[in-house]
Amino acid sequence: MSYKMSRAAYANMFGPTVGDKVRLADTELFIEVERDFTTHGEEVKFGGGKVIRDGMGQSQVTREGGAVDTVITNALIVDHWGIVKADIGLKDGRISAIGKAGNPDTQAGVTIIVGPGTEVIAGEGKIVTAGGMDSHIHFICPQQIDEALMSGITCMLGGGTGPAHGTLATTCTPGPWHIARMIEAADAFPMNLAFAGKGNASLPGALVEMVLGGATSLKLHEDWGTTPAAIDCCLSVADEYDVQVMIHTDTLNESGFVEDTIAAIKGRTIHAYHTEGAGGGHAPDIIRICGQPNVIPSSTNPTRPYTVNTLAEHLDMLMVCHHLSPSIPEDIAFAESRIRKETIAAEDILHDIGAFSIISSDSQAMGRVGEVAIRTWQTADKMKRQRGRLKEESGGNDNFRVKRYIAKYTINPAIAHGLSHEIGSLETGKRADLVLWNPTFFGVKPDMVLLGGTIAAAPMGDPNASIPTPQPVHYRPMFGAYGKSRTNSSVTFVSQASLDAGLAGRLGVAKALVAVQNTRGGIGKASMVHNSLTPHIEVDPETYEVRANGELLTCEPASVLPMAQRYFLF
């Protein structure tokens, strides 16, 4: 017997379905459900008097017989590949299926079997995304990891050894000894971690040593001397050992100009950090490299998006991060050369048209580790308000823009760094590193963060209360952050060469060491999902005006942003 429900009543009970629209936080971004994998009238839902009960939505199937470990019911998936309603089955710490959950003995079309051994996470009215990846981390303090996790980041890649001055300025873990200590420390944290070695050397020996020591990538930084010789040497080692290279170019143009850097790269794949230039790089025209087919350009979040306060805060940040002195005129000139409103404004637009591919943090080194998602969606909102709908959109929604922007901190950094076989998207077979969001708090404050299918973090009320919700409610580590569950639910990424050289046996760490792969000639700008545009970029050396394919790129700074003070009263 059929039963008719209004759309509002259905959405309140089972979450939105095809044709329904959802607003993301307090932005002007609206998504529309494209497909519903569940079956109307056969939805599964947990609770008193609900469907997932013995003999109803719960079968007798054992785990060995095919029942999943966890089912997330009626979730709204937001990923680069689609915006869909589905049940999500998790097994062995991975996504086992996306489809229709239930009891195959009583329901048709079941692709996710719910059994007595299945836990339920209620996804009705929630958005589920892949865990974010922050690919520009200065490992200055371990407390960053908690901050990132609670914001929805489940993988952090970068370099450092703590608050050493090299780490305060550069994302490098120099030498195999320091890399080993950081890999050992990784066991203590509920986070997928990956470490970058220092790439600044004119001879390959020391770089090879770091790759064999476990570095997943090599970082070229101007503070260590990013000369053409160092660039060429570093990329040659990377090509031999299949690791990525990240570059922060020469702001002062001492060893060459942007043309010389492009020539030294020789068409090889490279990830260009803070390609706009405020974070560092050839002044004033490093932004030109975002038009190169072999360059994967990224932003760090202090310039995301361009606001009335952006320029004012950057000078002091830069002086601290790069060990500069306000009493030395040359240091002040160095800092001021990097901060240009024209290129920062252009950066907004280049993100919106898909010419910049990645957004990351630059944690504690001119960036905020807990604001990768927030700054990404603030940029998307600002661009919609200023530029209107994208030409790629169809229907009365912002689905394409949302897919473009979520790719910037999920799948694209994963592809760039050889991790997309494990993380970066919500797809069958990948790690179950997932984030649940209430749409009202989307991008700002997660409802729950899973690592390897285990709940690692969530907001939680007073532990002595009779129910979980009484104040004070704040983020707390969950069971996935403790004991062996911590080391089993997350991994440390390393180079394949280091595993072949016996790194796991030498270090004896508890976490699994997983190799990066396909970081070199197999990828490039064209591999960046929804963010692969390569326009011809020109920068006026006098006015700093930026043009893409002849069109002036400029926009006004925002004076008000969504996802800001409204969400952070306390």
UniProtKB/Swiss-Prot annotation:
The active site is at H322 (proton donor). The keyword Metal-binding applies. Binds 2 nickel ions per subunit. Keywords: Cytoplasm, Hydrolase, Metal-binding, Nickel. GO terms for molecular function: nickel cation binding; urease activity. It is an enzyme of class 3 (hydrolase). Ni(2+) 1 binds at H136, H138, K219, D362. Its cofactor is Ni cation. Belongs to the metallo-dependent hydrolases superfamily. Urease alpha subunit family. This is Urease subunit alpha.
